[in-house]
Structure formats: structure tokens, C-alpha cells
């Protein structure tokens, strides 16, 4: 268990704050703690809901890097309303609008449908 805790601490970038109580941590580090808890038992599928919401740009970069790294060894299901997040970390995109799948493809296929991610999202959800 100690080896797994050390690995998850390193993966999630928690080493600098390891001895601090969670209530004293920034939102970014608290997000990382949640990710570490989810990873502790090595799940095949990791589900993340808005993992960068409310984070500063440096924290967003770090969390996105961690998500990309984790995606190399497991399935990561990411729920987000931030389209730049989709482009930064996803290799498959599913848009759900009013309970129906309106797009299922790669970020490249999504970009090919319009000038910007916002435009594509608007087209798919305004019909």
C-alpha cells in the first residue's frame, strides 16, 4: 500500500503538500487529492467531472498533463463544459444534448465540422 500511495502522490503532484491538512490546501491541490483517492486502487476506468473547474492556468496545465498521462494506462471518462479541455486531453469526444448523443468522434473530426469548437457545439446543440 505504501508503494501505491507514493506512486499516486507523485502522479498527482501532491509531494509538496503531503504533510498539510486538506482544509489548508488550495482548490487545485484539493482537486488533485480527489484524483489521488480515485487512483489509489488502480481502477481500469477513471471518471472525472469538471476536473479543472475553478483552477488557475498553472493548475489547469498540471491537471491536464496528469489526465493525459493517466489516459495512457486506463480509460479516462471526462465530463466537462470547457471545450478547450476536450481539445487538450480527449482522443474521443461525445456530445450529449437533451439526453441524446449528437456527436461521437475524434477531436479532429469535430474540428473539421466548423471553424471553432464553440461553433461546432452551437451547431450540434441548436438544431
Report each predicted region and the residues it spans.
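Conserved beta-strand-loop-alpha-helix hinge in the C-terminal portion
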Residues: 100-122
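ABC transporter nucleotide-binding domains
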Residues: 1-97, 102-103
Amino acid at each position: 500500500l505504501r508503494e501505491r500511495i507514493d506512486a499516486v502522490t507523485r502522479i498527482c503532484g501532491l509531494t509538496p503538500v503531503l504533510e498539510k491538512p486538506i482544509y489548508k490546501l488550495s482548490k487545485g491541490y484539493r482537486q488533485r487529492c480527489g484524483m489521488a483517492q480515485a487512483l489509489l486502487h488502480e481502477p481500469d476506468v477513471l471518471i472525472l467531472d469538471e476536473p479543472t473547474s475553478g483552477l488557475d492556468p498553472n493548475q489547469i496545465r498540471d491537471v491536464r498533463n496528469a489526465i493525459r498521462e493517466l489516459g495512457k494506462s486506463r480509460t479516462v471518462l471526462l465530463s466537462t463544459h470547457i471545450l478547450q479541455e476536450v481539445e487538450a486531453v480527449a482522443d474521443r469526444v461525445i456530445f450529449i444534448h437533451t439526453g441524446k448523443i449528437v456527436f461521437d468522434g475524434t477531436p479532429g473530426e469535430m474540428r473539421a465540422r466548423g471553424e471553432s469548437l464553440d461553433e461546432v457545439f452551437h451547431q450540434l446543440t441548436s438544431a
